[in-house]
């Protein structure tokens, strides 16, 4: 994936593509020119690793010529990678006309009348008690239940500063604090503080995402055992989870911000728009 290649070809210090990469004693990688920006050792005869504080003397620092050649190749291939990973419009033939399942909504979540939008509030809602409902985590599931085939849906995240969307196993424990992780049965992407995007791998995978991200396309392919996320603003690829298990049903997952009580941080499921225009079938709920 494009973001994978770029992430693994980037300087640990400046986060740009590596230029004349070098290794420190501990294996830390950075650009040769970034060495001058690293903290000096107390004796002044070496530099400290920003991660582990191991001292590297001048003679310890090794140039990574093979890595430099690899990074050059990755940079040259980036336009092709981005083109290959641009969203295929034909995914939309699998679009699902779903709504939010109110019976799963945690009681601080407000669900719109059309059952497509959700935001968090400090006021507790008076809803019936049921085992399907999340408590205490501010989450809600989509009405669809996926066991096979391909499925696609779109979510407007708008200007929300914090959110998580994706899929989860139907069997997840909803009566405990939710920790988003593949190991826990969640395959999601999300954002914190308007700027830190991450995928729910273990450990988390930080994502390079357009900060103007407004609308996300999600494509679940149970034939290939994968779920992919796309920025619908420019069609670029955000992240793909591979080798997801298919031993039980999946549900669409949504969690709006709960750290901004004075603002309505709304996320919304997009309705299917006039499928007859394309003369193509649309998946039922």
UniProtKB/Swiss-Prot annotation:
<comment type="subunit">
    <text>Interacts with PSMB1, UBE2A and CCNB1.</text>
</comment>
<dbReference type="GO" id="GO:0001674">
    <property type="term" value="C:female germ cell nucleus"/>
</dbReference>
<protein>
    <recommendedName>
        <fullName>Ret finger protein-like 4A</fullName>
    </recommendedName>
</protein>
<keyword id="KW-0479">Metal-binding</keyword>
<dbReference type="Pfam" id="PF00622">
    <property type="entry name" value="SPRY"/>
</dbReference>
<dbReference type="GO" id="GO:0008270">
    <property type="term" value="F:zinc ion binding"/>
</dbReference>
<dbReference type="InterPro" id="IPR003877">
    <property type="entry name" value="SPRY_dom"/>
</dbReference>
<dbReference type="GO" id="GO:0061630">
    <property type="term" value="F:ubiquitin protein ligase activity"/>
</dbReference>
<dbReference type="InterPro" id="IPR003879">
    <property type="entry name" value="Butyrophylin_SPRY"/>
</dbReference>
<dbReference type="Pfam" id="PF13765">
    <property type="entry name" value="PRY"/>
</dbReference>
<dbReference type="InterPro" id="IPR001870">
    <property type="entry name" value="B30.2/SPRY"/>
</dbReference>
<keyword id="KW-0963">Cytoplasm</keyword>
<dbReference type="InterPro" id="IPR013083">
    <property type="entry name" value="Znf_RING/FYVE/PHD"/>
</dbReference>
<dbReference type="InterPro" id="IPR022723">
    <property type="entry name" value="RDM_domain_RFPL"/>
</dbReference>
<dbReference type="InterPro" id="IPR013320">
    <property type="entry name" value="ConA-like_dom_sf"/>
</dbReference>
<feature type="zinc finger region" description="RING-type; degenerate">
    <location>
        <begin position="11"/>
        <end position="53"/>
    </location>
</feature>
<dbReference type="GO" id="GO:0005737">
    <property type="term" value="C:cytoplasm"/>
</dbReference>
<dbReference type="InterPro" id="IPR037960">
    <property type="entry name" value="SPRY/PRY_RFPL"/>
</dbReference>
<dbReference type="InterPro" id="IPR050143">
    <property type="entry name" value="TRIM/RBCC"/>
</dbReference>
<keyword id="KW-0863">Zinc-finger</keyword>
<dbReference type="Pfam" id="PF15227">
    <property type="entry name" value="zf-C3HC4_4"/>
</dbReference>
<keyword id="KW-0539">Nucleus</keyword>
<dbReference type="GO" id="GO:0010468">
    <property type="term" value="P:regulation of gene expression"/>
</dbReference>
<feature type="domain" description="B30.2/SPRY">
    <location>
        <begin position="78"/>
        <end position="276"/>
    </location>
</feature>
<dbReference type="InterPro" id="IPR006574">
    <property type="entry name" value="PRY"/>
</dbReference>
<dbReference type="InterPro" id="IPR001841">
    <property type="entry name" value="Znf_RING"/>
</dbReference>
<dbReference type="GO" id="GO:0045087">
    <property type="term" value="P:innate immune response"/>
</dbReference>
<dbReference type="Pfam" id="PF11002">
    <property type="entry name" value="RDM"/>
</dbReference>
<keyword id="KW-0862">Zinc</keyword>
<dbReference type="InterPro" id="IPR043136">
    <property type="entry name" value="B30.2/SPRY_sf"/>
</dbReference>
